[in-house]
């Protein structure tokens, strides 16, 4: 064991006796701290071992290496039964680092301070070192954290690139940025919800007390005075600069400060999960103080550097301007997922080989990391690889000794950034849009570099479909640009690296990587330009965000500024400077805005309030300039060369990325790429999005959408006022304008000037204006109008405008549920991708994907044209594919412009699935709009290039998981959701169902969505082939009322429907018997014309497991059932009739059931699900798999248990909801027709899942169910008379078959749970035998006999209690269901009940007595047994009774299921001949 000072000592610790172990852990990967022992309890096992000390870092538990996760450690510790074997790592002796007065001071009087003080121990054992050079004392100070070991880091998504070939990564030597591993790992693991977590790693955190991550801030050596309340920015920045080489850090730090001073605005906005707070006594804090002390002197000469050299440094560093790594400025926590993958850890400059290898590797990872990106874009990736290789050669980090010496880090994020930005720039130049990777040659879409593509880390950004056509053009331009690009990169690289030799290597690496993507320095070496550009970045952020009514960027800018400068003075200075610049720039931008707005109509003016004008057409070479960029352009006017264009492009790109307008850039690029070739008017469509953003209340998209939209051509087309005050886009036709600094001028010139001046109206006025205009438009169906509302969407008067940029703003304002269901963001993008790769025909019109892509963030605004006759108006369907939740309805075109009253009554969120985005085509007043609109939709959806198949107007087309609370595996269900969403939303090939002709009838479609509707959506998605015919069938049946179709179900509705509804259902079945034969499911729940008042929706979450369990067999069953149904038509009709008659049975028969199982049905049903899964809950993996199956195969989900009133109808209804009405109707009908019996007989015991001893409810239910089934068998005889009239009702048979199958599956689950329980029982018995043997060896024989008797009595008493409670429950149930006339039988039952009650009371006394004996026996046993064996004894006793109860409960459930199964099978086989 190496014992050099400062080296780590690995100490094995073995604790015995079982929990509690007597020590406390703190830190962990979750907190970005090492997992250390914070406390050892006196007298505890850890203290008794005398090997563990506070401050020890856990590295191994029971032979399992730890990788920093506290949760993992806790699981391993809890999993230790009696022996806990640990390996802890502690510093042998503290080492004061060279230049670390802080540590030296700590160590002065305390040689063993490392082991005695929590504070130093944390600092010393912290997995991430403070960035010292690995060559000097770094071995002691850079222990390789277990979390950072190479093989582990390779599992961190794109962090695989951490494994550098030449990088020594051995235990005890931590590479310079281990800290980054923590955020990186976290980001990779949590990318699903922390979209900007990487931004938080790369940008300054928002709170002063929350130091930025190591990578994001390169501490500046300037006079860094760290105040207590504000850790120096460098605290966390495990910058790879070596404190021993002061000169190395000086320049770069100053530059980093100056840089970040300007970028405090952007940096501030990194709004991902905030960095974990850094303890004041942690290594980052001490490191900051060290930097204060030591680097203060080093940086003194450089103090004025920000003022003197700032321009030069910024020229070198501008790329770092947080644009690449911080998607900021109000972007709502949406740094792209790849930001996370490109965690800004120090570049590994160990060698050129490393750099090249990592560069290529990282570029590949960066490309591959987007979760939803098209994997087929290998050609793009190949180009990127080449570019990466070239760049690697260019950026030979290894060639610069300082860079190599100061930091060796396996986390090649800068290379990732290089690769991704190279990809950005390369592909930008190639895509000539400068903002987004063109769609791959194979037609797949690539968004901006992975750094800028996935908002929320999930949406796979996709270009508009038009991108495919543009690809070739972009490709043509690729070569010259790439050459120039590489040349400029090389030049800028050399500039950066030379400038940074004495500077912060990390900075240099970043700068180089950034420059590669930006390529500004090469062509625009002027310091001022870069400086302006940097400032502009921040200003862009400030301006865009602030002008959209969000002052957050400002505050964040201040915070960022405060944090970005190490010393408070410099921070304030930088902040003031940047704020002044921001103010000036903002003023200039506003002036430009005012000028542009004066020349535009009020509508465009409204659109422009979000942002200054963007160029109407952008040449392929340059991305659309944001307003702020436009204001910056004058500084670049003197840069005419193509390289300069590239510079501008990259600058703008970065500016956009700094605002995290990855989406915005995507959309603008998409617009640039696609719209450049599309009619400019289409671009104008995007501006409408800007309008919509105002109403977009959902937090996650407010700023994002505003900015994204603002960036999309707010000015892409001008709007003029038509006599009806409907702003219509005046399409500017100059599509290819040269990309030069004069773009902003082109903006003005290219956009037609509207004659009317408009004054910037306040938000309320704009909103009012939009609402009014939308109303007026909705009421006036002028054939010439292409825009529905003032939406500046490119609405060309095409009979079929696939560019459905719609305009209703209603949804944008309130997405009450959006926030609950944002998680499904990738769904939309999944859907997007499938459409981007559609045929080039769609490139003409910005299709829905473009709507998303161009809108970056505004996925919630899926716009689709609703064609009402000639009026090709576009409406934004706000719950678009994003499945963001309920949204407001479009104003009804047929009503007074307001939402249809019917919809309002039901609080319906009309959702149309027709055009790519669900439009509300059918949602107009169902009576007024039909025919033409439908046909237009059909035409549009069936257009040759239009791969989006029309879809029946149905309620929210959410994946089920979005609506239903998800208890299960969200990730696994995501794929299912995406699949279902893309399928359900867009791939249906069936003709769109004609608009509702009968308003009264189809209003049910638009009731508030219930889970069944959602589930049905899933079902529909996968059962498209079957349902296509159903859709057509629906057209004929459209007039049929569908009573509960879309309503949330309550048990009462299902079980207690009036008989007249049954008669109505029969009538309907007869009317459509032919259709039902071919598609039995089409005939179902049209029994009620007007649904009963809407009950509170049941909690579907409880039914997920049960439904999931029944998934796989459902499809097969359905097919079989359809065949069987035809064969059993008559039988089932009879049974149905019998069911109806049964409803007439005396209420006493059902009284117990109705009161016990029907009313609390909601509660019971969950339990019915639990019957199958309650015990299986222990088999978590199984249930999760079932859930996955459910998510992946929602279509297979058929209501298995009609008995589960709520879930069952839901299940049955789903298919019908989407067209196979029969199934759902059948469910409802059956639920009502085969009255409560069936549904009750299957409703699970109320108390079954509850306290095991409360069996009365359980037995009550089970007996009732059995009786109901028995009676159900007899019902056919009673109902025989009325059966002849009715046709065969095979629906009931189908339901019974489903019930049989579901019960069978449930039984299999229960039996599996029983087997697992038996294993537990056996294990506990073995433990009991061991305890018994130990006791026998140590205690007296009479005492041992007491123990033995106690254990036996405990078993007997528990079984007795269970048996008596069960019998008593059965008797009570019999009493409840007995006929009032059977007095004799009733008396017998009452007497028996009294007897059982007395016996149960005696048994309870016995149990109390046994409990008393247990205490005595425990006192006796505790005298003989050591602590660990005593714990074994306690565990054995406690588990013995619990396992007995659980076993009995499982047995009862299995017995009940078998009874139900038997009864169902018998009733199913009873035919008319048997009566």
UniProtKB/Swiss-Prot annotation:
InterPro entries the record matches: ASD2_dom, PDZ, PDZ_sf, Shroom_fam
Coiled-coil stretches noted in the UniProt entry, renumbered to this chain: 1380-1470
Pfam families in the record: ASD2, PDZ
Gly residues bias locations: 558-568
CDD domains: PDZ_shroom2_3_4-like
PROSITE patterns for the chain: ASD2 (PS51307), PDZ (PS50106)
Gene Ontology CC entries for this record: actin cytoskeleton; actin filament; apical plasma membrane; basal plasma membrane; cytoplasm; cytoplasmic side of plasma membrane; focal adhesion; GABA-ergic synapse
GO molecular function, one term: actin filament binding
Low complexity bias spans: 624-635, 658-667, 1110-1125
Compositionally biased spans, kind Acidic residues: 1128-1145
Feature: compositional bias, Pro residues: 1090-1099
Keyword annotations: Actin-binding, Coiled coil, Cytoplasm, Cytoskeleton, Developmental protein, Phosphoprotein
Region feature Disordered, mapped onto this chain: 151-175, 202-321, 432-523, 542-577, 610-644, 658-688, 727-753, 772-791, 1022-1041, 1055-1185
Localization: Cytoplasm, Cytoskeleton
Compositionally skewed regions (Basic and acidic residues) per UniProt: 294-312, 471-485, 542-557
Gene Ontology biological process: actin filament organization; brain development; cognition; regulation of postsynaptic membrane neurotransmitter receptor levels
Keyword Cell division: no
Tissue expression pattern: Detected in most adult tissues examined. Expressed in brain, lung, heart, liver, kidney, muscle and ovary. Expressed throughout the brain, with high expression in the brain stem and cerebellum and weaker expression in the hypothalamus, the hippocampus and the olfactory bulb. Expressed in wide range of cell types during development, including vascular endothelium and the polarized epithelium of the neural tube and kidney.
PANTHER family on file: APICAL PROTEIN/SHROOM-RELATED, PROTEIN SHROOM4
Family that this chain belongs to: Belongs to the shroom family.
Subunit structure of this chain's protein: Interacts directly with F-actin.
Role description: Probable regulator of cytoskeletal architecture that plays an important role in development. May regulate cellular and cytoskeletal architecture by modulating the spatial distribution of myosin II.
Protein name: Protein Shroom4
Source species taxonomy: Eukaryota, Metazoa, Chordata, Craniata, Vertebrata
């Amino acid at each position: 064991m190496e014992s050099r000072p400062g080296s780590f000592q690995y100490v094995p610790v073995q604790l015995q006796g079982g929990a509690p172990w007597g020590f406390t852990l703190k830190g962990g990967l979750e907190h970005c701290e090492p997992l250390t022992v914070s406390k050892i309890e006196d007298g505890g096992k850890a203290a008794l071992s005398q090997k563990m000390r506070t401050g020890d870092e856990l590295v191994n538990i029971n032979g399992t290496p730890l990788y920093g996760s506290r949760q993992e450690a806790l699981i391993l510790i809890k999993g230790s039964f009696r022996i806990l074997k640990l390996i802890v790592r502690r510093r042998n002796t503290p080492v004061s680092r060279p230049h670390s007065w802080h540590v030296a001071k700590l160590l002065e009087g305390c040689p063993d301070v490392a082991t005695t003080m929590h504070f130093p121990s944390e600092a010393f054992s912290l997995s991430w070192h403070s960035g010292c050079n690995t060559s000097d004392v770094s071995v002691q100070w850079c222990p390789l954290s277990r979390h950072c070991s190479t093989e582990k880091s390779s599992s961190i998504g794109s962090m695989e690139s951490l494994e550098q070939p030449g990088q020594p990564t051995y235990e005890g030597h931590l590479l310079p940025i281990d800290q980054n591993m923590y955020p990186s790992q976290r980001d990779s693991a949590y990318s699903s919800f922390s979209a900007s977590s990487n931004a938080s790693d790369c940008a300054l955190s928002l709170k002063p007390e929350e130091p930025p991550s190591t990578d994001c801030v390169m501490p500046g050596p300037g006079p860094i005075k760290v105040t207590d309340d504000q850790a120096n920015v460098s605290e966390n920045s495990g910058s790879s600069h070596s404190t021993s080489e002061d000169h190395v850090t000086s320049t770069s730090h100053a530059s980093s400060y100056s840089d970040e001073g300007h970028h405090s605005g952007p940096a501030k906005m990194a709004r991902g999960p905030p960095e974990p707070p850094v303890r004041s006594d942690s290594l980052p804090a001490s490191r900051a103080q060290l930097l204060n002390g030591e680097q203060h002197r080093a940086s003194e000469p450089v103090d004025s550097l920000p003022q003197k050299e700032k321009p030069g440094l910024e020229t070198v560093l501008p790329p770092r301007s947080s644009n690449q790594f911080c998607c900021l400025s109000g972007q709502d926590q949406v740094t792209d997922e790849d930001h996370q993958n490109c965690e800004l850890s120090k570049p590994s400059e160990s060698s050129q080989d490393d750099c090249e290898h990592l560069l290529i590797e990282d570029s590949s990872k960066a490309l591959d990391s987007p979760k939803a990106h098209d994997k087929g874009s290998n050609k793009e990736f190949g180009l990127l690889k080449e570019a990466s290789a070239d760049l690697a050669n260019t950026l030979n980090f290894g060639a610069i000794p300082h860079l190599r010496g100061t930091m060796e880090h396996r986390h090649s994020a800068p290379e990732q950034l290089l690769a991704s930005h190279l990809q950005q720039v390369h592909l930008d130049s190639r895509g000539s849009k400068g903002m987004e990777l063109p769609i791959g040659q194979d037609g797949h879409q690539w968004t901006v570099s992975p750094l800028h593509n996935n908002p929320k880390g999930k949406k796979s950004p996709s270009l508009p479909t038009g991108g495919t056509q543009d690809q070739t053009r972009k490709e043509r331009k690729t070569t010259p640009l790439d050459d120039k690009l590489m040349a400029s990169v090389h030049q800028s690289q050399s500039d950066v690296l030379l400038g940074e030799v004495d500077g912060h290597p990390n900075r240099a690496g970043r700068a180089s990587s950034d420059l590669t993507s930006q390529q500004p320095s090469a062509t625009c070496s002027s310091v001022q330009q870069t400086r302006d550009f940097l400032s502009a970045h921040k200003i862009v952020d400030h301006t865009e965000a602030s002008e959209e009514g969000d002052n957050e960027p400002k505050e964040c800018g201040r915070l960022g500024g405060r944090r970005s400068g190490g010393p408070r003075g410099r921070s304030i200075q930088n902040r003031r400077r940047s704020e002044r610049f921001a103010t000036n720039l903002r003023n200039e931008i506003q002036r430009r805005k005012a000028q542009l707005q004066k020349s535009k109509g009020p509508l465009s003016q409204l659109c422009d309030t979000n942002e200054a004008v963007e160029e109407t057409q952008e040449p392929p070479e340059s991305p659309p300039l944001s307003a702020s960029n436009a204001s910056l352009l004058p500084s670049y006017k003197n840069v005419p060369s193509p390289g300069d264009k590239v510079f501008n492009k990259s600058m703008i790109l970065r500016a956009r990325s700094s605002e995290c307008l990855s989406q915005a850039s995507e959309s603008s690029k998409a617009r640039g790429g696609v719209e450049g070739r599309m009619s400019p008017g289409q671009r104008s469509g995007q501006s409408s999005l800007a309008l919509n953003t105002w109403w977009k209340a959902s937090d996650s998209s407010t700023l994002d959408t505003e900015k994204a939209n603002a960036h999309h051509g707010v000015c892409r087309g001008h709007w003029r006022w038509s006599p009806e005050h409907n702003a219509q886009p005046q399409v500017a036709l100059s599509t290819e304008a040269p990309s030069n600094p004069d773009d902003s001028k082109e903006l003005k010139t290219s956009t037609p000037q509207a004659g009317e001046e408009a004054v910037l109206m306040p938000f309320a006025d704009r909103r009012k204006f939009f609402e009014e205009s939308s109303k007026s438009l909705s009421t006036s169906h002028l054939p010439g109008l292409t825009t529905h509302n003032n939406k500046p969407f490119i609405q060309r008067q095409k009979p079929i405008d696939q560019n459905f940029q719609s305009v209703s703003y209603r949804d944008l304002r309130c997405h009450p549920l959006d926030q609950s269901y944002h998680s499904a963001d990738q769904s939309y993008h999944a859907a997007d991708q499938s459409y981007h790769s559609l045929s080039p025909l769609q490139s003409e019109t910005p299709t829905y994907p473009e709507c998303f892509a161009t809108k970056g963030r505004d996925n919630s605004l899926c716009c689709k044209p609703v064609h009402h006759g000639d009026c090709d108006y576009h409406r934004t369907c706000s719950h678009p594919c994003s499945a963001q939740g309920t949204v407001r309805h479009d104003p009804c075109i047929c009503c007074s412009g307001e939402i249809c009253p019917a919809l309002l009554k039901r609080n319906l969120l009309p959702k149309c699935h027709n055009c790519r985005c669900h439009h509300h085509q059918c949602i107009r007043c169902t009576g007024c709009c039909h025919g033409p609109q439908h046909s237009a939709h059909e035409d549009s959806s069936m257009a040759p290039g239009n791969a989006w198949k029309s879809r029946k107007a149905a309620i929210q087309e959410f994946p089920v998981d979005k609506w239903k609370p998800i208890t299960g595996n969200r990730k696994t269900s995501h794929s299912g959701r995406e699949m279902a969403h893309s399928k359900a939303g867009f791939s249906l090939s069936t003709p769109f169902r004609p608009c509702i002709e009968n308003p009264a009838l189809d209003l049910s479609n638009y009731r508030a969505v219930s889970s069944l509707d959602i589930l049905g959506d899933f079902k529909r998605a996968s059962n498209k082939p079957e349902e296509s015919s159903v859709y057509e069938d629906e057209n004929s049946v459209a007039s049929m009322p569908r009573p509960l179709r879309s309503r949330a179900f309550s048990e009462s509705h299902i079980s207690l429907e009036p008989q007249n509804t049954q008669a109505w259902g029969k009538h309907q079945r007869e009317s459509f018997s032919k259709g039902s034969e071919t598609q039995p499911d089409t005939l179902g729940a049209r029994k009620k014309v007007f649904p009963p008042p809407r009950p509170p929706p049941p909690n579907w979450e409880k039914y997920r497991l049960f439904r999931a369990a029944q998934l796989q067999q459902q499809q097969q069953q359905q097919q079989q059932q359809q065949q069987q149904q035809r064969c059993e038509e008559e039988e089932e009709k009879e049974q149905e009739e019998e069911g109806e008659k049964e409803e007439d049975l005396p209420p006493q028969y059902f009284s117990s059931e109705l009161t016990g199982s029907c009313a609390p049905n909601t509660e019971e049903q969950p339990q019915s699900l639990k019957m199958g899964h309650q015990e299986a809950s222990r088999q978590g993996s199984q249930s999760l798999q079932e859930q996955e199956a459910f998510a992946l195969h929602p279509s297979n989900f058929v209501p298995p248990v009609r008995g589960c009133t709520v879930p069952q109808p839901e299940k049955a209804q789903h298919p019908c909801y989407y067209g196979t009405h029969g199934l759902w109707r059948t469910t409802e009908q059956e639920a009502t027709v085969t009255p409560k019996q069936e549904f009750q007989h299957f409703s699970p015991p109320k108390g079954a899942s509850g306290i095991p001893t409360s069996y009365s409810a359980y037995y009550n239910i089970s007996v009732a169910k059995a009786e109901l089934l028995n009676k159900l068998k007899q019902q056919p005889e009673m109902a025989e008379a009325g059966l002849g009239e009715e046709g065969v009702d095979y629906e009931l048979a189908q339901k019974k078959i489903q019930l049989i199958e579901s019960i069978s599956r449930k039984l299999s689950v229960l039996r599996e749970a029983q087997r697992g329980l038996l294993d537990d029982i056996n294990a506990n018995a073995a433990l009991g035998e061991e305890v018994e043997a130990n006791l026998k060896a140590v205690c007296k024989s009479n005492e041992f006999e007491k123990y033995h008797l106690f254990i036996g009595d405990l078993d007997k008493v528990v079984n007795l209690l269970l048996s008596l409670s069960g019998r008593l429950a059965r008797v009570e149930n019999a009493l409840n269901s007995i006929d009032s006339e059977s007095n004799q039988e009733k008396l017998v039952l009452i007497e028996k009940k009294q007897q059982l009650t007395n016996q149960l009371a005696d048994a309870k006394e016995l149990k109390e007595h046994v409990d008393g004996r247990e205490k005595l026996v425990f006192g006796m046993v505790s005298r003989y047994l050591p602590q660990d064996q005593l714990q074994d004894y306690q565990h054995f006793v406690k588990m013995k009774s619990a396992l007995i109860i659980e076993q009995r409960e499982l047995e009862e459930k299995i017995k009940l299921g078998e009874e139900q199964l038997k009864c169902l099978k018998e009733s199913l086989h009873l035919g008319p001949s048997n009566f």
